[in-house]
């Protein structure tokens, strides 16, 4: 395709005149086409967050040699279930994955834009961003959404990464949480959760985290945590055996980030539900037949 010469010249002059950081794709969009960024709205529009679908609970756990991040599949719109099979966890580069809770449309665009941001930097600079650089880039993106967040369009990411520059590969898993203003915190306890069911998920993980010894045990604890969150939080969806809908998860270790096969998640979900099922022990007969 041939671009008209005037358009090409105007774009080039705008870039040179504004000193855009070409290594940042998000900054380039902000200068050249801000309407393409998530939640490109202006102040004064009123709160509209409750009118849009919201994604809910994300959990992340470190295990020896890596980190796992998982999310439920439900989205809600007020008191209604808007979707049952929403994907909330995305691999964003070879050693990084993000899960985002909040306004669903913005959350998905955040994850996609962040993946492009990391790829764009690596293509221009010839090297991938360091772990610290990845955290800073995501913090800047979250901060850029602050105006929309104040109108109810909040999207909070949870970052899981494997630091290839860590001195000890067994403790190279990283979990970073963010607030709406772009502040971030590296979790030292080994686990974190965000979203409406996060308080229940974290309470569950706290009791089970001692059982985490590898990726598979971390996955089981994550499934249990999401099950517990769904038990108390209506906006979080637990494993749905009838529809065959299960949480999604990503593991990240020295070999890179990979999606956990749905077959394995379904197997663990059935085990968790089976282990928690019990005969009716209520009533005058105490459950005796």
From Swiss-Prot:
It comes from the Bacteria. PROSITE patterns: PROTEASOME_BETA_2. It is found in: Cytoplasm. It is an enzyme of class 3 (hydrolase). Its main location: cytoplasm. Component of the proteasome core, a large protease complex with broad specificity involved in protein degradation. Pathway: Protein degradation; proteasomal Pup-dependent pathway. GO terms for biological process: modification-dependent protein catabolic process; proteasomal protein catabolic process. One of its GO terms (cellular component) is cytoplasm. It holds the Pfam family Proteasome. The lineage of its organism: Bacteria, Bacillati, Actinomycetota, Actinomycetes, Mycobacteriales. InterPro entries: Ntn_hydrolases_N, Proteasome_sua/b, Proteasome_suB-type, PSB_actinobac. GO terms for molecular function: threonine-type endopeptidase activity. It catalyses: Cleavage of peptide bonds with very broad specificity. Belongs to the peptidase T1B family. This is Proteasome subunit beta. The gene is prcB.
């Amino acid at each position: 395709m041939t671009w008209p010469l005037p358009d090409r010249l105007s774009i080039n002059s705008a870039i040179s005149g504004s000193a855009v950081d070409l290594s940042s794709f998000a900054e380039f969009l902000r200068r050249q086409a801000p309407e393409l960024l998530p939640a490109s709205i202006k102040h004064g529009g009123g709160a509209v967050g409750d009118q849009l679908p919201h994604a809910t609970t994300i959990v992340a756990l470190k295990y020896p040699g890596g980190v796992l991040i998982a999310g439920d599949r439900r989205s809600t719109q007020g008191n209604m279930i808007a979707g049952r099979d929403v994907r909330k966890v995305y691999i964003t580069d070879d050693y990084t994955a993000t899960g985002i809770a909040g306004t669903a449309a913005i959350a998905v665009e955040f994850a996609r834009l962040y993946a492009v941001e990391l790829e764009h930097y690596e293509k221009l600079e010839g090297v991938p961003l360091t772990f610290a650089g990845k955290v800073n880039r995501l913090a800047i993106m979250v901060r850029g959404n602050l105006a929309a967040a104040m109108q109810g369009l909040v999207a909070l990411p949870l970052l899981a990464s494997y630091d290839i520059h860590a001195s000890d590969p067994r403790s190279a898993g990283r979990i970073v949480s963010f607030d709406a203003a772009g502040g971030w915190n590296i979790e030292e306890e080994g686990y974190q959760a965000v979203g409406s069911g996060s308080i229940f998920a974290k309470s569950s993980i706290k009791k089970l985290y001692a059982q985490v010894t590898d990726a598979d045990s971390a996955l089981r604890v994550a499934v249990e945590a999401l099950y517990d969150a769904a038990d108390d939080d209506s906006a979080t969806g637990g494993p749905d055996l009838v529809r065959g809908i299960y949480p999604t998860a990503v593991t990240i270790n020295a070999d890179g980030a990979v999606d956990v096969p749905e077959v394995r998640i379904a197997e663990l979900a059935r085990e968790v539900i089976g282990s928690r099922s019990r005969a009716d022990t209520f009533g005058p007969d105490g459950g005796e037949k």
